[in-house]
């Protein structure tokens, strides 16, 4: 060992030094051996082990050992557990357990280069099988290390080479897990472990059952064990855990501390007050242990082998679990089934066949098949596996870990025997640590948990272990061997009463020991099932590897012996809840375990003393801390208890432990129960297990947990000696204990007695134990560590569920610092430091503030549920009533320790209180203060008890509340409040969760009053608590008395409350004001804690965050007032979050003005949902949303975002939306709603933005901040629109109506203001930085800029969202989709509010769908403004077409329309003349002369031509009406009705009507671009005249469906891939083109539109034009069939006259575009909006491509669909959301048709192409687009060649051809129509020249077909008839 030590100060070297480590090792080793899988055992033949002779060098042997604990298969463990449950707990039962018993395998961790080991050929990974010829099987790790260290100059090792080591092979990874500190220390001669026949059943079972947690590196043994919670894959699956435990460097030193060991007999509970001498404790253990644990004496430098031997309680002591004689438990290589190989030898032997003394300590998990359950001697088994299995069977029975855990759970649920609990614990506790782990002191490895944590987490574990031998022996556990190994403790427990639970502890790391004697489960123990707090303590010790450290402080045997000795003496009786409460071990384990995952480090290293706790903790640690099943308290308590109990182990160490416990929270409870847990370790044991476990556990915990293993060994003794026995109060989980143990006065006395416990080990009956406790309390008082303080200190802060947190483990903080009642605890901690490792964990435990981060996690997890409870419990249990169960104390946070005890361990408290623990600690600062009760004890009403910011000065035993800071104040100036003096003597102080939802609030309960104080943060709160506790506890006697009174009162209240309201809430007792306050906090916060689960540090931390943020006092009083006000206001609403004013909503942590729900939801979405497609668009599950709302309304401000229910982002987003929807006062407030709407309608974009910003700034703080926050969030979401498809418009669509609304549901507003709502929200999202920036001087982005920004995004048709901005101008930004349309119509086109309102209605109806569609279209389209342009063009075209239609409803009119369209194109080209053109167009339309000499004017109609089928004026009018209806119905029924009315009226004035119709169609197209485009396309594709209104409506409905699909696709973030632009980039471009044209056309046609629509509706077409455009999309498409026909005819004539050249150019451009994929550019060219043309061409081209794709698809679909029934069309329309593209596609098609008209041959090709496309269309949109592109290229090429001649022909044939080309245009979207019209206009001439006959044939015949098809029959199948014919004819023409 010296060599190892020197070479690698790792486990072997170091661990031998720690007796505790040894113990852990032994236990672990045994357990491991037991863990060997039976299967391996039988068929396994060990290759002969290799013998290596090492010569000791100056540095030692030059190798380090690792302790690897192999756990039995769960099945085996389960069997054992079953056996135990069946009553097979005798030695025989124990034998089966041997196979279940974790096997300590010791393997070479490291070989020093050039060292003796290296020279000898010892290799890393060699498993030690024999040391000097002595098998390590049955020896604990510490024993093996001791053997090695004690070896002479030469060391002969029999090792199993790593490659041959089954265990290592099985646990190749686990065996070498990190985090295991090598053991350093001197191990005295460690006697060989007694034969495996030891009835380790219980302890081994526990160990085995417990998943091995890898102890932190701090504790080599425990660490290793903890570090390997791995089941051997090769071995039986049941062998769930194998842990490599590194023995702490100096467990031996720790071992020396005296520990009060309580031996738990079934019948009698005895407290062993170990003398300070480790040897005595060891001797006690040895006595108990008997020969079996003889070897453990040797471990870790225990000079006295007999000492090392643990006295095992008689088997009878273990009721149902076969109790291994003390010798087995102690001597058997540690408690329970771990081979006593210290350096891993024992384990390695267990792991491998005894014959193979594999040097490599990395054992593989071998679960020896159950062999003889009699004496399990490895020599008796052929295979190591078999041996281990048998041993495991003996130890654990056949139970698997899971089985044991299950039985443990059952035990915790049922007040079952500890034996049963043990199995349950084994199986139930996820966290398990082999005994070695548990024994190995884990200074920092395991996170300690406060008692409350442990209660929350492992009440069952705690309960299951009465006081585990380790815990009981914790006093002796301080002895290095014990300290070294929690296992030793476990052995004590196993061998004694603890065999049951010890085994579990090892397996779990929280050993779930059914008390073999009693058969009580640990849970039962917590419930008070067993009267043996000591057992429980030992159990706790076993549970947490922390006890591993405890063993270090104590000789493992003595530790075990001490613990065991008590165990046999007292039966495992159901401990009174008080007793249970008193059981610090449990508490300690819980605290120890608390947040830590059972990494060996924390568990075993943290508290050597709390070995059993440590063991217990391991279970809790790895898995238990988060496993509420065991019971929140128990879970927490286990870890904490490990620490606490370790404290309990050493009387003085326990003092430390109590402090630690206070830090741990549960430890506080434990200590509190014991009052002087440390001092009264014996006393603690004597009351129940308190003294025993408190002392032993505390010491061990301190020594081991805090110290490194070596330090633990050394310090453990000092810890035991020096640590006042801190009675660690266990906190039973709120629901776990059937009866919460109420600490009996004896417990309290015991706590107090902890100090007074005599150093000498004494066997005391329960009464004697109580007396000892009292003595110790007295001693503690004498020593200055007040027993009351200790007990209170032992009470964990309510917030410190994580008292065993790493912080505690790491930081050696005096318990006093942690324990507000630091009088006792501080000395305890001071004493503990001898074990450096131990002190850290101890301190961590003691200092809940050290655990703040962790403790809050667990505490919040648990402490919300039972934070107060644990604190109060601890306080009550410790201070007032030892009787109080930890649970009660826990639940009674008011009862909690004296004011100082609960939660005063905040980091600041640490700073303040640590130094001031025993002196008047003056603290001052601003606190928010509220008086809960008056002097009469009456509750102050909420109104009478407002939160006030006071400058609080703590002087002596009084708090002075001052209005202003008279001295330094870290807080904001105190609010005015008379200076008050609050006497804090004997006050109870705890963290308040129920009284207020505020965070960082602590409750100060004096004899007559109760106050709430809110600190700025948790640290400050804890500092205050600590300081108050310290000052309040200055007079220990008075404080103790007062505290007891208060605690009694609190307990009564709590009991009353609990009786009335069930423990689960852990609400404070109802009875008194205090109770009420407690209860309320419990209701409000504890459920939250529960939700979070006591075991979840994350949840706790989050909860803390929330708590902090929510309650951290704002620096300003007003904020504080609001925050304070909110929680209270919410209280009435039960923390209502939904349906309450923003002011009343729980504030976010970081912003009091932002509701917590908003903050949480936004953060969750930002964290996880920014890339979620359709986030906020896709609704969440209503049930989940409702459930979450109800939960939040219940006051659950602590949101566990890790909860599965918070995983569904859609639910979260829906929850957020629901929150805003349910706000009584909308986010934009009812008061300012109209102002926002009006501001949004401001035409000047800049002024609009400024006005909006002014209004936003005028919003109330909460509304403003929330809006700011939400806008930033939505902005972040929109920034990821590429992935989530939620552009600002989509988000605005989602949130606009939700945010911008009035409380009263006004449908009119909803419809009319929807665009404004969308626009406002969209603007906020887009302009968030500007709106919420402090720089108001900056000019807002202009509307055009905004529109461009919008435009940059594929904006859905949020015309209503962007109407204001869009209306401001027709810039490309304006053109951005609906926004630009609305902007145009609104701004550029004129205010047109009527139109705007109507448009808003329409757009609002269609917004969602159209937006989505447009988004996708826009996505292909660089900007949505193109769509607007297209809309404009469509409007222009529509106007022109309409104008033309009135003139010519006949072919001539169509020709005129075409000419007009061409002229419109020209007009588009000439924007300046657009108005004139429009007028001319009107005239032309009115004249309906194909020769209207206004080609420029008609140049726009060409766009229309695409849209307008050459129909008679009547038909066009009808079609317009129908279109309006359809487009309106498709786009917006209201709009359609309006449009229909208007249009039908204007139809008389065909130009206006048509203009409006076109506008309407345009609007529809816009809308339909999003929502009704498909229907519009169908309609457009079909001449509306031909299409009956029904068909139109059907088509529109189909279009709507398509829109819905598209919107769905969009919401899904998927591009609309049905028949749309998406499929066809051309269509998309055409859409863009159409929009561009629309915008362009709109500009010229604004007046026309105004006229056509009626100036109000069309007013400058700003809104109406948008509406019209949308309508025109549908109407255009529909009417464009007629109009386009008419116009095409007219325009063709016109174009022939005037626009042929332009048209030719346009056609050439269009053809080129088609060739280039810029088919839309043709429309642009045709449009002649040259400035926009290039970009528009590109975009339009893209759109055309998309649209052509869509149109081709739509056309094919239409062709087929037209033939199909209307519903079929609907289906296809649905499929054709593309219909947007489709409309435009028709436009494009019309362009193509124009081109095709130019090329008759291409027409045929088109037919073939169409045929090709038809099959492709439905299935292959891309192929269609490609095909369209190809066809276009062909068409464009042919058309280009034929352009000029065709143009002439077109003019001639325009009348004929136009109808044909228009039919395609109807299919195309407005932009397509415009393009088609343009192309038709421009191409019409060319087509007229070249293909006129064909086109005419196709067009005319097709038009006739279309018209005929458009007949009602055709309408019935509009897509099929008109679609097919129109699409094909036009499409073919186009092709």
UniProtKB/Swiss-Prot annotation:
InterPro entries: PDZ, PDZ_6, PDZ_sf, PH-like_dom_sf, PH_domain, Rho_GTPase_activation_prot, RhoGAP_dom
Keyword Membrane: yes
PROSITE patterns reported for this sequence: PDZ, PH_DOMAIN, RHOGAP
Pfam family, one: PDZ_6
Entry function: GTPase-activating protein (GAP) for rhoa and cdc42.
Annotated ranges, domain Rho-GAP: 1140-1332
PANTHER family, per the entry: PDZ DOMAIN-CONTAINING PROTEIN, RHO GTPASE-ACTIVATING PROTEIN 21
Annotated protein name in UniProt: Rho GTPase-activating protein 21
Compositionally biased tracts (Low complexity): 441-451, 673-685, 1059-1072, 1376-1393
């Amino acid at each position: 060992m010296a060599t190892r030590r020197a070479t690698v100060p790792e486990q072997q070297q170091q661990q031998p030094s720690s007796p505790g480590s040894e113990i852990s090792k032994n236990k672990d080793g045994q357990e491991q051996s037991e863990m060997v899988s039976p299967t391996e055992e039988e068929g396994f033949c060990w290759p002969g082990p290799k013998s290596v002779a090492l010569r000791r060098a100056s540095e030692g042997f030059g190798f380090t050992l690792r302790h690897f604990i192999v756990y039995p298969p769960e099945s085996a463990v389960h069997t054992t557990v079953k056996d135990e449950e069946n009553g097979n707990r005798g030695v025989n039962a124990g034998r089966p357990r041997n196979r279940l018993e974790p096997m300590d395998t010791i393997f070479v961790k490291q070989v020093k280069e050039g060292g003796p080991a290296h020279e000898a050929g010892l290799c890393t990974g060699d498993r030690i099988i024999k040391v000097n010829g002595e098998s390590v099987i049955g020896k604990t790790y510490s024993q093996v290390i001791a053997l090695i260290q004690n070896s002479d100059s030469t060391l002969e090792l029999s090792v199993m080479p790593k490659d041959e080591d089954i265990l290592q092979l099985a646990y190749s990874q686990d065996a070498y897990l990190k985090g295991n500190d090598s053991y350093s220390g001197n191990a005295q001669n460690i006697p060989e472990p007694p034969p495996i026949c030891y009835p380790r059943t219980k302890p081994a079972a526990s160990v085995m059952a417990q998943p091995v947690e890898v102890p932190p590196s701090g504790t080599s043994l425990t660490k290793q064990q903890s570090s390997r919670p791995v089941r051997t894959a090769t071995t039986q699956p049941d062998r769930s855990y194998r842990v490599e435990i590194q023995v702490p460097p100096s467990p031996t030193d720790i071992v020396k501390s005296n520990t009060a060991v309580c031996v738990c007999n079934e019948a009698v509970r005895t407290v062993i007050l170990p003398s300070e001498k480790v040897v005595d404790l060891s001797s006690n253990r040895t006595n108990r242990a008997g020969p079996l644990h003889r070897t453990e004496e040797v471990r870790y430098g225990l000079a006295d082998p007999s000492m090392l031997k643990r006295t095992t309680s008689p088997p009878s002591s273990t009721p149902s679990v076969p109790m291994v004689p003390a010798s087995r438990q102690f001597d058997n290589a540690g408690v329970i089934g771990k081979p006593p190989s210290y350096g891993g030898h024992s384990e390695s032997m267990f792991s491998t066949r005894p014959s193979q003394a594999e040097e490599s300590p990395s054992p593989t998990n071998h679960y020896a098949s159950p062999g003889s359950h009699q004496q399990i001697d490895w020599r008796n088994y052929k295979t190591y596996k078999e041996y281990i299995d048998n041993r495991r069977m003996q130890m654990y029975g056949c139970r698997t870990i899971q089985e044991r855990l299950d039985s443990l759970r059952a035990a915790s649920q049922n007040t079952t025997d500890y034996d049963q609990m043990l199995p349950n614990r084994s199986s139930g506790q996820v966290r398990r640590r082999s005994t070695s782990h548990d024994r190995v002191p884990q200074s920092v490895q395991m996170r300690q948990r406060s008692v409350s944590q442990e209660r929350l987490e492992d009440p069952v574990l705690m309960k299951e272990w009465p006081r585990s031998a380790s815990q009981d022996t914790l006093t002796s556990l301080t002895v290095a061997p014990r300290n070294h190994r929690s296992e030793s403790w476990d052995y004590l427990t196993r061998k004694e009463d603890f065999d049951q639970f010890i085994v579990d502890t090892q397996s779990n790391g929280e050993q779930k020991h059914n008390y073999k004697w009693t058969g009580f489960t640990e849970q039962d123990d917590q419930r008070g099932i067993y009267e043996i707090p000591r057992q429980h303590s030992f159990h706790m010790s076993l549970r947490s590897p922390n006890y591993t450290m405890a063993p270090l402080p104590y000789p493992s045997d003595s530790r075990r012996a001490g613990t065991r000795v008590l165990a046999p003496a007292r039966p495992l009786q159901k401990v009174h809840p008080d007793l249970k409460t008193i059981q610090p071990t449990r508490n300690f384990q819980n605290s120890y375990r608390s947040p830590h995952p059972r990494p060996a480090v924390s568990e075993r290293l943290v508290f050597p003393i709390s070995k059993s706790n440590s063991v217990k903790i391991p279970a809790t640690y790895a898995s238990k801390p988060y496993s509420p099943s065991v019971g929140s308290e128990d879970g927490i308590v286990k870890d904490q208890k490990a620490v606490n109990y370790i404290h309990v182990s050493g009387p003085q160490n326990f003092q430390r432990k109590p402090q630690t416990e206070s830090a741990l929270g549960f430890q506080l409870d434990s200590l509190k129960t014991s009052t002087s847990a440390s001092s009264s370790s014996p006393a603690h044991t004597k009351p129940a297990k308190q003294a025993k476990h408190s002392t032993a556990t505390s010491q061990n915990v301190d020594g081991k947990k805090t110290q490194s293993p070596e330090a633990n060994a050394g310090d453990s003794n000092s810890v035991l000696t020096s640590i006042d026995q801190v009675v660690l109060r266990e906190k039973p989980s709120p629901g776990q204990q059937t009866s919460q143990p109420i600490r009996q006065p004896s417990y309290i006395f015991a706590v107090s007695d902890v100090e007074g416990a005599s150093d000498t080990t004494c066997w005391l009956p329960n009464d004697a134990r109580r007396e000892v406790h009292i003595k110790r309390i007295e001693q503690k008082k004498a020593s200055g560590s007040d027993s009351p303080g200790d007990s209170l200190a032992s009470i964990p802060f309510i917030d410190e569920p994580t008292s065993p947190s790493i912080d505690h483990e790491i930081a050696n903080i005096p318990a006093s610092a942690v324990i507000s009642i630091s009088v006792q605890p501080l000395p305890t901690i001071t004493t503990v430091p001898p074990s450096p490792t131990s002190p850290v964990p101890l301190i961590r435990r003691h200092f809940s503030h050290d655990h703040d981060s962790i403790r809050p996690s667990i505490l919040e997890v648990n402490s919300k549920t039972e934070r107060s409870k644990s604190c109060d419990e601890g306080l009550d249990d410790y201070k007032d009533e030892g009787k109080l169960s930890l649970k009660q104390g826990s639940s009674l946070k008011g009862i909690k320790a004296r004011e100082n005890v609960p939660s005063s361990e905040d980091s600041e408290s640490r700073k303040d209180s640590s130094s001031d623990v025993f002196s008047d600690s003056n603290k001052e600062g601003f606190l928010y203060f509220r008086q809960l009760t008056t002097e009469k004890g009456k509750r102050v009403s909420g109104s009478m008890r407002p939160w006030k910011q006071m400058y609080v000065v703590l002087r002596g035993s009084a708090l002075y509340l001052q209005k202003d800071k008279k001295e330094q104040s870290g807080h904001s100036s105190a609010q005015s409040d008379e200076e008050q003096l609050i006497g804090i003597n004997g006050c109870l102080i705890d963290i308040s969760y129920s009284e207020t939802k505020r965070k960082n609030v602590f409750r100060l309960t004096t004899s007559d009053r109760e106050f709430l104080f809110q600190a700025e943060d948790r640290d400050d709160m804890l500092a205050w608590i600590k300081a108050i506790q310290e000052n309040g506890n200055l007079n220990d006697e008075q404080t103790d008395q007062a505290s007891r009174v208060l605690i009694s009162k609190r307990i009564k209240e709590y009991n009353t409350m609990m009786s009335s309201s069930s423990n689960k809430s852990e609400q404070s007792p109802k009875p008194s004001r205090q109770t009420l306050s407690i209860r309320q906090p419990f209701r409000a916060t504890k459920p939250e804690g529960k939700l979070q689960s006591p075991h979840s540090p994350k949840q706790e931390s989050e909860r803390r965050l929330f708590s902090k943020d929510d309650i951290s006092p704002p620096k300003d009083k007003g904020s504080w007032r609001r925050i304070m006000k909110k929680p209270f206001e919410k209280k009435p609403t039960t923390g209502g979050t939904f349906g309450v004013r923003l002011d009343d909503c729980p504030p976010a942590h970081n912003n009091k003005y932002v509701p917590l729900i908003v903050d949480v939801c936004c953060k969750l979405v930002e964290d996880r949902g920014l890339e979620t497609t359709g986030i906020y668009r896709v609704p969440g599950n209503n049930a989940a949303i409702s459930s979450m709302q109800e939960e939040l309304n219940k006051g659950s401000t602590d949101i566990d975002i890790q909860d599965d229910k918070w995983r569904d982002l859609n639910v979260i987003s829906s929850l957020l939306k629901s929150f805003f929807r349910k706000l009584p006062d909308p986010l934009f407030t009812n008061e300012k709603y109209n102002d926002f709407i009006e501001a949004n309608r401001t035409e000047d974009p800049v002024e609009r933005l400024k006005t909006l910003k002014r209004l936003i700034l005028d919003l109330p703080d909460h509304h403003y901040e929330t809006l700011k926050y939400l806008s930033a969030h939505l902005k972040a979401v929109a920034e990821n629109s590429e992935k989530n498809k939620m552009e600002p418009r989509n988000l605005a669509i989602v949130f606009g109506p939700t945010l911008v609304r009035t409380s009263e549901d006004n449908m009119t507003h909803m419809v009319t203001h929807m665009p404004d709502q969308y626009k406002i929200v969209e603007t906020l999202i887009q302009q968030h930085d500007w709106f919420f920036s402090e720089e108001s001087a900056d000019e807002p982005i202009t509307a055009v800029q905004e529109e461009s920004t919008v435009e940059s995004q594929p904006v859905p048709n949020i015309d209503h969202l962007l109407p204001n901005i869009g209306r401001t101008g027709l810039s490309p930004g304006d053109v951005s989709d609906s926004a630009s349309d609305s902007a145009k119509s609104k701004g550029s086109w004129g205010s047109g509010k009527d139109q705007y309102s109507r448009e808003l209605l329409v757009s609002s109806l269609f917004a969602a769908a159209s937006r989505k569609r447009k988004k996708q279209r826009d996505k292909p389209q660089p900007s949505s403004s193109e769509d607007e342009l297209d809309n404009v063009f469509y409007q222009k075209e529509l106007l022109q077409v309409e104008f033309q239609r009135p003139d010519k409803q006949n072919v001539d009119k169509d020709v005129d329309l075409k000419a007009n369209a061409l002229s419109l194109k020209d007009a588009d080209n000439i924007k300046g003349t657009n108005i004139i053109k429009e007028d001319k167009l009107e005239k032309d339309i009115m004249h309906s002369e194909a020769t209207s000499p206004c080609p420029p004017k008609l140049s726009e109609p060409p766009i229309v031509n695409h849209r307008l089928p050459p129909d008679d004026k009547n038909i066009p009018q009808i079609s317009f009406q129908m279109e309006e209806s359809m487009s309106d119905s498709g786009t917006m029924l209201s709009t359609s009705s309006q449009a229909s009315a208007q249009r039908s009226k204007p139809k008389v004035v065909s130009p206006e009507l048509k203009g409006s119709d076109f506008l309407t169609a345009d609007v529809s197209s816009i809308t339909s671009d999003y929502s009704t485009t498909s229907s519009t396309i169908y309609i457009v594709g079909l001449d509306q005249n031909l299409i009956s209104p029904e068909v139109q409506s059907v088509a529109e409905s189909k279009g709507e469906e398509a829109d819905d699909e598209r919107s769905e696709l969009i919401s899904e973030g998927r591009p609309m891939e049905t028949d749309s632009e998406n499929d066809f980039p051309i269509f998309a471009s055409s859409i863009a083109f159409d929009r561009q044209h629309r915008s362009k056309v709109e500009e010229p046609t604004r007046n026309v539109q105004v006229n056509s629509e009626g100036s109000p509706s069309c007013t400058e077409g700003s809104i109406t034009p948008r509406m019209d455009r949308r309508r025109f999309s549908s109407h255009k498409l529909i009417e464009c069939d007629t109009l386009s026909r008419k116009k095409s005819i007219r325009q063709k004539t016109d174009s022939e006259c005037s626009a042929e050249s332009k048209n030719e150019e346009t056609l050439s451009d269009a053809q080129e575009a088609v060739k280039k994929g810029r088919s839309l550019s043709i429309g642009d060219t045709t449009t002649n909006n040259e400035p926009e043309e290039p970009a528009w061409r590109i975009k339009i081209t893209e759109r055309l491509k998309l649209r052509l794709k869509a149109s081709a698809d739509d056309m094919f679909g239409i062709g087929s669909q037209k033939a199909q029934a209307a519903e079929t069309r609907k289906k296809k329309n649905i499929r054709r959301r593309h219909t947007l593209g489709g409309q435009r596609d028709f436009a494009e098609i019309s362009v193509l048709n124009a081109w095709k008209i130019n090329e008759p041959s291409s027409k045929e090709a088109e037919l073939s192409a169409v045929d090709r496309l038809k099959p492709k269309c439905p299935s292959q949109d891309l192929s269609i687009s490609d095909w369209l592109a190809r066809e276009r290229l062909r068409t464009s090429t042919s058309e280009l060649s034929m352009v000029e001649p065709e143009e002439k022909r077109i003019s001639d044939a325009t009348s004929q051809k136009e109808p044909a080309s228009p039919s395609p245009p109807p299919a195309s979207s407005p932009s397509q129509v415009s393009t088609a019209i343009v192309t038709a206009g421009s191409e019409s001439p060319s087509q007229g020249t070249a293909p006129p006959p064909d086109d005419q044939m196709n067009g005319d015949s097709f038009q006739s077909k279309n018209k005929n098809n458009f007949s009602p029959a055709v309408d019935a199948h509009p897509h099929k008839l008109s679609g097919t014919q129109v699409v094909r004819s036009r499409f073919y023409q186009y092709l």
